[in-house]
């Protein structure tokens, strides 16, 4: 009989986050308990609590992992980026983000739904927005002032989140994917209007 492989810290956190994701998608964040999450892992209660003290900490890591996933996707398309066509490039990337059907999207949808009733989630949302803005600036370096002010950034964030919610809650993802070009054109139009 072979020795049981000991999981690394990253593997254990990933196992916990995968369990949490399943429960959050099924029950919603407000009804998710640490006990639910622990039950979906191969770890002991103490083992899970060693890495995460509460569901909020796990959700925060899930949201950060989702941002890292999205940044990798954008970086993989940087060869399409051309100076002078920044708005078009960003519109394409933002529309892809809005309609992407990935592991993190249903969790993000639950996060958006729950943040209205949970002030701690709203604080996490504001923190994630700051990190997103910094990442956009980092991706394009100083070639392009992505968002001239916070009001513009807030508007574009709200616009994207409305499409993300509709994609999931209203099952509109397929319709949006079919009309992707129109969504990109709308995003370019909105961006150019608000950047004046």
Tell me what each language-model feature is.
Residues 15, 19-57, 61:
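Helix-turn-helix
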